[in-house]
Amino acid sequence: SVGFKAGVKDYKLTYYTPDYETKDTDILAAFRVTPQPGVPPEEAGGAVAAESSTGTWTTVWTDGLTSLDRYKGRCYHIEPVAGEENQYIAYVAYPLDLFEEGSVTNMFTSIVGNVFGFKALRALRLEDLRIPPAYVKTFQGPPHGIQVERDKLNKYGRPLLGCTIKPKLGLSAKNYGRAVFECLRGGLDFTKDDENVNSQPFMRWRDRFLFCAEAIYKAQAETGEIKGHYLNATAGTCEEMMKRAVFARELGVPIVMHDYLTGGFTANTSLAHYCRDNGLLLHIHRAMHAVIDRQKNHGIHFRVLAKALRMSGGDHIHSGTVVGKLEGERDITLGFVDLLRDDFVEKDRSRGIYFTQDWVSLPGVLTVASGGIHVWHMPALTEIFGDDSVLQFGGGTLGHPWGNAPGAVANRVALEACVQARNEGRDLATEGNAIIRKACKWSTELAAACEVWKEIKFEFAAM
């Protein structure tokens, strides 16, 4: 007789376990599964659980040398997606022991590493992950977090203001530094390297760092406020990235920046550790995210990438603007904005949150609204994102007819007017335009900005 039962058997026999009670230490995943025609959802869900944990396509002799019951992923619930044909949400529980501590890289390699090319599935999307406190505690998380950042910058009770320097490619280092100085002098808190500014022939990184540091110190002296410029440390190797971060620290600047998806989670986590040890804030850009998260039925939802960033480490992350998008998008976006900032977030399917997430006092991340926004959007942005955010106006600062500094003044005046109105109990949703118009009366810079972008009409519903 044969020592073990060889052969291929259905995944659902081993990996679909609807009676399973999830443990507090399990990592839970919600997958949107689109099976191939003729594949039952239980088999598809079981296949996902198997391929992303202990399973392979056939029974193997070495299965007898370990305890599958202890280590296997389990598909414990399947529900059809309302309004979609042949789409299901498969819930999978993974034992904590399957994952290396403090490694976002390993977590993703396990959960989404292999299973997305699986033949039995037409498409697969990871919609959400529940990270148990036991695993959260193995991560350092953001270098500083929201409260420490405010204390470092001495800025309270309002969103922070930023601006991406444009044209993003082609300026010399000295002209780049000049643009930075004008923006900071006018009243912005931060300026930003574009995500694709690394170290190109027309502007090497060291020159840029030096001129930007000079701009920061001059603007601080002139305004009496703490200023920063997100110096992009992203590089072709981790060693080069660290070299840039070290140089930024030696210049005494407050913040550096990293592209966490193109740079990779391993590089990002190393940089985050360096930033915490050396008092640097870390701004995170999400370049490449849409490649992964844009398709509705395949890929990884951004809320998962956002959770991963909070674990890997970053003090700011770009998270969309909400403004002018569809209503549903707003709720979904605010769902992952809360996942980034709050300590404890309740399950809420209407906001796309599949699991209750307890971050057990891992520091929070400031969400960054950036892209196509201008002064008329300020009331909406203040209302939607609240104080713990960075509002970034690239063209909305540099496109001002009088130049960068007046563009910065216009944004700062608009923001202060909105914050004051909110604190006085006025409703930004209904009175936003009036608040901006009134502020124009005592700021010619704002009036000029409002004139340039007045065509873009903007109304939004109250929360």
Swiss-Prot record:
The keyword Metal-binding applies. Its cofactor is Mg(2+). It catalyses: 2 (2R)-3-phosphoglycerate + 2 H(+) = D-ribulose 1,5-bisphosphate + CO2 + H2O; D-ribulose 1,5-bisphosphate + O2 = 2-phosphoglycolate + (2R)-3-phosphoglycerate + 2 H(+). Binds 1 Mg(2+) ion per subunit. The keyword S-adenosyl-L-methionine does not apply. It is found in: Plastid, Chloroplast. Its main location: plastid. Keywords: Calvin cycle, Carbon dioxide fixation, Chloroplast, Disulfide bond, Lyase, Magnesium, Metal-binding, Methylation, Monooxygenase, Oxidoreductase, Photorespiration, Photosynthesis, Plastid. SUPFAM superfamilies: RuBisCo, C-terminal domain (SSF51649), RuBisCO, large subunit, small (N-terminal) domain (SSF54966). Mg(2+) binds at residues 192, 194-195. The active site is at 166 (proton acceptor), 285 (proton acceptor). Substrate binds at residues 114, 164, 168, 286, 318, 370. One of its GO terms (molecular function) is ribulose-bisphosphate carboxylase activity. The modification N6-carboxylysine is found at residue 192. InterPro entries: RuBisCO, RuBisCo_large_chain_AS, RuBisCO_lsu_C, RuBisCO_lsu_C_sf, RuBisCO_lsu_fd_N, RuBisCO_lsu_N_sf, RuBisCO_lsuI. The record marks 325 as: Transition state stabilizer. GO terms for cellular component: chloroplast. The modification N6,N6,N6-trimethyllysine is found at residue 5. It comes from the Eukaryota. Heterohexadecamer of 8 large chains and 8 small chains; disulfide-linked. The disulfide link is formed within the large subunit homodimers. The basic functional RuBisCO is composed of a large chain homodimer in a 'head-to-tail' conformation. In form I RuBisCO this homodimer is arranged in a barrel-like tetramer with the small subunits forming a tetrameric 'cap' on each end of the 'barrel'. Belongs to the RuBisCO large chain family. Type I subfamily. This is Ribulose bisphosphate carboxylase large chain. It comes from Pelargonium grandiflorum (Geranium).
